[in-house]
Swiss-Prot record:
<dbReference type="InterPro" id="IPR002869">
    <property type="entry name" value="Pyrv_flavodox_OxRed_cen"/>
</dbReference>
<comment type="subunit">
    <text>Heterodimer composed of an alpha and a beta subunit.</text>
</comment>
<dbReference type="InterPro" id="IPR050722">
    <property type="entry name" value="Pyruvate:ferred/Flavod_OxRd"/>
</dbReference>
<dbReference type="Pfam" id="PF01855">
    <property type="entry name" value="POR_N"/>
</dbReference>
<dbReference type="Pfam" id="PF17147">
    <property type="entry name" value="PFOR_II"/>
</dbReference>
<feature type="short sequence motif" description="YPITP motif">
    <location>
        <begin position="263"/>
        <end position="267"/>
    </location>
</feature>
<protein>
    <recommendedName>
        <fullName>2-oxoacid:ferredoxin oxidoreductase 2, subunit alpha</fullName>
        <ecNumber>1.2.7.11</ecNumber>
    </recommendedName>
</protein>
<dbReference type="GO" id="GO:0018491">
    <property type="term" value="F:2-oxobutyrate synthase activity"/>
</dbReference>
<dbReference type="InterPro" id="IPR002880">
    <property type="entry name" value="Pyrv_Fd/Flavodoxin_OxRdtase_N"/>
</dbReference>
<feature type="binding site">
    <location>
        <position position="266"/>
    </location>
    <ligand>
        <name>substrate</name>
    </ligand>
</feature>
<dbReference type="InterPro" id="IPR022367">
    <property type="entry name" value="2-oxoacid/accept_OxRdtase_asu"/>
</dbReference>
<dbReference type="InterPro" id="IPR029061">
    <property type="entry name" value="THDP-binding"/>
</dbReference>
<keyword id="KW-0670">Pyruvate</keyword>
<feature type="binding site">
    <location>
        <position position="356"/>
    </location>
    <ligand>
        <name>substrate</name>
    </ligand>
</feature>
<dbReference type="InterPro" id="IPR053400">
    <property type="entry name" value="2-oxoacid_Fdx_oxidoreductase"/>
</dbReference>
<dbReference type="Pfam" id="PF01558">
    <property type="entry name" value="POR"/>
</dbReference>
<dbReference type="GO" id="GO:0006979">
    <property type="term" value="P:response to oxidative stress"/>
</dbReference>
Length: 642
C-alpha cells in the first residue's frame, strides 16, 4: 500500500503553495489520491509557511506525522520541521544555511526560539541549522543537501535569465529533487508544472528546466532512487483537485447562485474569488431556448464592509435571487443585526461562515471550531435560523446547494458552517464525486403570479407564507414587527400571531429535513465507546476508528451535521447503550458538548480538544481515546502541528 506524506516549508511568498500543488498534481497524474493543506502566517512575506500532503491509493482521511520527506527551502523550515521526518525518511535542505543561528531568523516566533535553544543546550550543541540536521540524522533521517544557489546559477545560464528572475524557481529545484528521490517519474512532475502554470509558456519552460537540473544533480550526487513509484489505481482517469473554498463556490454556482457579496477576510475570500473567475456560465438546451441566450452571469460584489455585504444580499434575496455572503468570525460579528432582520423579515439568505482561531483577530490563518454557538445564537431577540456544518470537501459541495434549498423552502437564514482547514486544504476528486443532480434545486413557495390581495406574511398552517419577488406585488419588508401585509404594528395579539408563525416553521424544518442530513452514525453501532463531533474533524475521526479497531478498540462516531435545530432525539438514539461518550472539538469551551447537554439527557464523560490552530490528526484522536479509556481523564488536549 502506498502511503506517502511530505512537508514543503519555506518563507511566506516563496512559492510554497505552488510547490504543494505541483506535488499534488504530480501524484494525481500518476494515479493516486491526495490530501494537502497549506499552513501559513498572517503576513504577506517572510514568515514560515508550509504545505503538508499525504498520498494514498484512496482519498486520504487525515494528514500524517511523521512524514517521509521534508523539503526545507530556508533555515527556519529546517528548525521548524527537522523532528517531523520519520526514521528512513529524507530531509532536503541547503547546506549553505548550516551556520544560520536561531536568533538570526527574525520572523521566527520567540517561544519557538527559546524551545529550540533549550533543546540544543541540553545536547551541548550550538543553536544553528547544522545542529538540527545532525539531530534529524541521529533520529534516522537521510540527509539530502542541495546547493540551491549554485543550482540557480546553472538555471540562469541555461535560460539566459538573471538569477533574480530564476530564483522564483527555487521551490521547483527543491521539490523536483525530493519527488525524484521518492520515485516519482520526471515526466509527471513536468506535466504537473504545465498544468500549474497553464498559459504561461516562459514560466513553464523555466520550471521544467529547473526540474532537469535538479534531477541531474540528484542522480550524480545520490544515484538513482531505490525504487520507482508504480502507477496508482486512478491513472488515466479524469480527476480534479479542489479546495473547500473551490467546492463551496462550485456548489453555490450549480445551485443557482445569483448574487454573492463579500468583504475580504481570511479564509473566506478565496471562495468569492473562485466565483469571480467563473461568474459567466454557459447554458444550453430548453433553458437557453427559454431565455434566448447561451450564458448567464453571477453578480459578485466586493462591498465596503461586512454590514453592507449581508444587507446587500438581503435585498437581492427579497428580489428573488439566490443570494449569499461569505465571511469569517470577525466579519460575522458585524452581520449579527442583519441576521436578526432576515429572521424577522423571513428573507432566504445563505451566510457561509468559515471558522478560524479566535477570539478577536486571534490567529487569522489558523483553523478552529470556536464559532459554533456564535452561529446558532447570532442575531438579537428570538432569532432562530438553520445552522449546517459540513464534515468534508464533498459534503461542502452538496451542502452549499442544500443551504439555498432550505433557505428558500423555509424562508429563513441558513448559516453554512465550515472552517479554515476545509477552506485551504486540497483534495483529489473524481467526476462522480460531484453530481449536482443528487440535490435538485427547489425554491419552496415562490410565486410567479401573486394575487392582487397578496399578503407577504400570510398566516398559514406551516408558518411558511407564499413568497413573491420584490416588485412583483405590493408588499412591505421591514425589521419591525408587522401584520400579514408587512405593515408595522405593535398590537399584542398580532405580535403573538407572528411570533408563533415563525416558531411553527422550525417544527416543520425538524419534520422535513431528513434524519440523514441531521446526523450520521459511523463505525461500530454496537460499540460501548462513542465519539461525538461536528465539522472537519469527521475524516480524522473516521481514520482513528479504523486505527482503534486494528488495536482491538471498538467505537462508534456520531457526526452532528444540523446544529440548529439540534437533532436531540436522533443523537440520543445513536448513542443508545453507550457507556463512554467522548466529545471531539476544536474549541476549549466544549461548545458541542453544551448543546448535547441542553438538548438531550446525555452527559459526556470526556473530551478531546485541539486549540493550537492546526488541523486535527487521526493519530491524535486514536491516541487520546486510548488514553481516556486507560486513565479516565476528563479532557485530553492534543497539540501536534508546527
Amino acid at each position: 500500500m502506498v502511503d506517502i506524506s511530505l512537508i514543503i516549508g519555506g518563507p511566506q511568498g516563496g512559492g510554497i503553495e505552488s510547490a504543494g500543488q505541483i506535488a499534488i498534481k504530480s501524484m494525481v497524474l500518476l494515479g493516486y489520491e491526495v490530501l494537502g493543506s497549506r499552513e501559513y502566517h498572517s503576513n504577506i512575506m517572510g514568515a514560515h509557511s508550509y504545505y503538508h500532503l499525504r498520498v494514498q491509493q484512496h482519498r486520504p482521511r487525515s494528514l500524517k506525522l511523521p512524514v517521509d520527506g521534508v523539503l526545507a527551502l530556508d533555515a527556519e523550515s529546517v528548525f521548524t520541521h527537522f523532528r517531523d521526518v520519520r526514521p528512513g525518511g529524507i530531509l532536503v535542505y541547503d547546506p549553505g544555511t548550516k551556520s544560520t543561528r536561531v536568533d538570526a531568523i527574525q520572523p521566527m516566533a520567540g517561544p519557538l526560539k527559546k524551545r529550540l535553544k533549550s533543546l540544543f543546550d541540553s545536547r551541548g550543541m550550538q543553536p544553528v541549522v547544522e545542529s538540527a540536521v545532525k539531530l534529524a540524522e541521529e533520529a534516522g533521517a537521510r540527509i539530502v543537501g542541495l546547493p540551491l544557489k549554485e543550482m540557480l546559477k546553472t538555471l540562469s545560464e541555461r535560460t539566459g535569465a538573471p538569477v533574480a528572475r530564476v530564483s522564483r524557481a527555487l521551490n521547483t529545484l527543491g521539490l523536483a529533487s525530493m519527488l525524484y528521490m521518492l520515485g516519482v517519474p520526471v515526466e509527471y512532475i513536468e506535466k504537473a508544472i504545465s498544468l500549474q502554470f497553464a498559459g504561461k509558456e516562459k514560466v513553464i519552460n523555466m520550471n521544467v528546466e529547473a526540474v532537469r537540473i535538479a534531477v541531474d544533480y540528484v542522480r550524480e550526487a545520490f544515484g538513482e532512487p531505490e525504487s520507482r513509484l508504480p502507477p496508482g489505481p486512478r491513472r488515466g482517469q479524469t480527476m480534479m483537485v479542489a479546495t473547500g473554498n473551490d467546492l463551496v463556490a462550485m456548489g453555490k454556482i450549480v445551485g443557482g447562485l445569483g448574487v454573492i457579496t463579500y468583504y475580504p477576510i481570511t479564509p473566506s475570500s478565496d471562495e468569492a474569488l473562485y466565483v469571480e473567475k467563473h461568474s459567466y456560465i454557459s447554458i444550453d438546451g430548453p433553458l437557453a431556448e427559454k431565455l434566448g441566450y447561451d450564458k448567464i452571469a453571477v453578480a459578485i460584489v466586493q462591498m465596503e464592509d461586512e454590514l453592507a455585504s449581508i444587507n446587500a444580499v438581503l435585498g437581492a434575496a427579497a428580489a428573488g435571487a439566490r443570494a449569499s455572503t461569505t465571511t469569517s468570525g470577525p466579519g460575522f460579528s458585524l452581520m449579527n443585526e442583519a441576521v436578526s432582520l432576515a429572521v424577522e423579515a423571513e428573507i432566504p439568505v445563505v451566510v457561509t461562515l468559515w471558522m478560524r482561531a479566535g477570539p478577536s483577530t486571534g490567529m487569522p490563518t489558523r483553523t478552529g471550531q470556536q464559532d459554533l454557538l456564535h452561529s446558532i445564537f447570532s442575531g438579537h431577540g428570538d432569532a432562530p435560523k438553520i445552522v449546517l456544518a459540513s464534515g468534508d470537501h464533498v459534503e461542502a459541495f452538496y451542502d452549499a446547494i442544500k443551504a439555498f434549498n432550505w433557505a428558500e423552502e423555509f424562508q429563513t437564514p441558513v448559516i453554512h458552517l465550515l472552517d479554515k482547514y476545509l477552506a485551504s486544504s486540497m483534495v483529489s476528486l473524481a467526476r462522480e464525486d460531484l453530481d449536482p443532480s443528487k440535490v435538485p434545486i427547489t425554491r419552496g413557495k415562490l410565486l410567479d403570479n401573486p394575487p392582487a390581495d397578496y399578503r407577504r406574511y400570510e398566516v398559514v398552517e406551516d408558518g411558511i407564507s407564499p413568497r413573491a419577488r420584490l416588485g412583483s406585488a405590493t408588499m412591505v419588508i421591514t425589521g419591525l414587527e408587522h401584520d400579514e401585509y408587512g405593515y408595522a404594528t405593535e398590537d399584542p395579539v398580532m405580535r403573538e400571531i407572528m411570533m408563533f408563525k415563525r416558531e411553527r416553521k422550525f417544527k416543520v424544518i425538524e419534520e422535513r429535513i431528513p434524519d440523514e442530513e441531521k446526523a450520521v452514525l459511523h463505525g461500530d453501532s454496537e460499540a460501548s465507546v462513542a465519539l461525538v463531533s461536528f465539522g472537519s474533524t469527521k475524516q480524522p475521526i473516521l481514520e482513528a476508528l479504523e486505527m482503534l479497531r486494528d488495536e482491538g478498540v471498538r467505537a462508534r462516531f456520531a457526526q452532528v451535521r444540523l446544529l440548529y435545530p439540534f437533532p436531540g432525539r436522533l443523537v440520543e438514539e445513536m448513542l443508545e447503550g453507550v457507556e463512554k461518550v467522548i466529545m471531539v472539538e476544536q474549541n476549549l469551551l466544549g461548545q458541542l458538548a453544551m448543546l448535547l447537554r441542553a438538548h438531550t439527557s446525555i452527559k459526556p464523560d470526556s473530551s478531546i480538544v485541539k486549540i493550537n490552530g492546526r488541523p486535527l490528526y487521526s493519530f491524535e484522536v486514536a491516541g487520546a481515546v486510548k488514553r481516556i479509556l486507560e486513565t479516565g481523564e476528563e479532557r485530553v488536549v492534543v497539540s501536534h502541528g508546527s
